[in-house]
Amino acid sequence: MQVEAHLQKIIEKDGKVHLTLIDPASQTPDRAAEIALAAVEGGTDAIMIGGSTGASGTLLDETVIKIKENIHVPTILFPGSSAGLSKYADAVFFMSLLNSRDLGYVITNQVLGAPLVYRSQIEPISMAYLIVEPGGTVGWVGDAKLIPRKKPEIAAVYALAGKYLGMHYTYLEAGSGADSPVNPEMIGAVKQVLGENKLIVGGGIRNAETAKICTSAGADMIVTGTVVEEVKDVTAKVAEIVSAIKR
């Protein structure tokens, strides 16, 4: 089954999807595989692999290979640029950073990466990527014109544009390790215009309560990344969040 169809089946069954993000630059491939396995044991539905800096080349390939040896759930690339692609993954979030000032993140990296995706037959999942204040490292690297936290209507029209351009997913990103996640008002406004299209929310989600607030507001999928790198018991932390968001 294709990865996008697989995630849709999970939403139909459980109501929501949990994704764990692993940055290859943050640890060795072996450690990344350990984290991925622990997250899967906690109930995560797929492993996202990537980051805004340093996730490319041999390190990326070795990380994907090691993770796939350990787990049975899909691996999805989350590339910071065209260099963040690996033929060993199951799928890629083929995304455009719609609120970037730099055309490289809007379309040029996508043009450069498309031939590799085509040749390797990685499944592309089209996605509008939107960075919200505070934005963190990804906002700086991506030269994003950050969407103000208190302006949900701006996020909504960006998301609507992405939907009309044919993108299946929209990702609201507060930035890795953000002090607080995207607020519920913005999540709700975006989900309202997306309808059946899927909404992912990430950044600043460290516990079950926060994850539940995001899904109750309209998020279809939750991403946790920094927290799994920081806690000692990854399985317990992921299980806590998963149990809060799924029915």
From Swiss-Prot:
Its localization reads: Cytoplasm
Which coenzyme or cofactor does it need?
A: Mg(2+)
* Listed EC numbers: 2.5.1.41
Protein keywords: Cytoplasm, Lipid biosynthesis, Lipid metabolism, Magnesium, Metal-binding, Phospholipid biosynthesis, Phospholipid metabolism, Transferase
This protein's GO cellular component annotations are: cytoplasm
Q: Name one Pfam family in it.
A: PcrB
Keyword match Repeat:
no
Task: List GO molecular-function terms, semicolon-separated.
Answer: imidazoleglycerol-phosphate synthase activity; magnesium ion binding; phosphoglycerol geranylgeranyltransferase activity
The main location class comes to cytoplasm
Question: Which reaction does this enzyme catalyse, per its entry?
Answer: sn-glycerol 1-phosphate + (2E,6E,10E)-geranylgeranyl diphosphate = sn-3-O-(geranylgeranyl)glycerol 1-phosphate + diphosphate
Q: Where does Mg(2+) bind?
A: 23, 52
GO BP term, example: glycerophospholipid biosynthetic process
What highest taxon heads this organism's lineage? Archaea
Enzyme class label: transferase
InterPro entries in UniProt: GGGP/HepGP_synthase_sf, GGGP_HepGP_synthase, GGGP_synth, IGPS_HisA/HisF
What family is reported? Answer: Belongs to the GGGP/HepGP synthase family. Group II subfamily.
The function of this protein is:
Prenyltransferase that catalyzes the transfer of the geranylgeranyl moiety of geranylgeranyl diphosphate (GGPP) to the C3 hydroxyl of sn-glycerol-1-phosphate (G1P). This reaction is the first ether-bond-formation step in the biosynthesis of archaeal membrane lipids.
* Name of the protein in its database record: Geranylgeranylglyceryl phosphate synthase
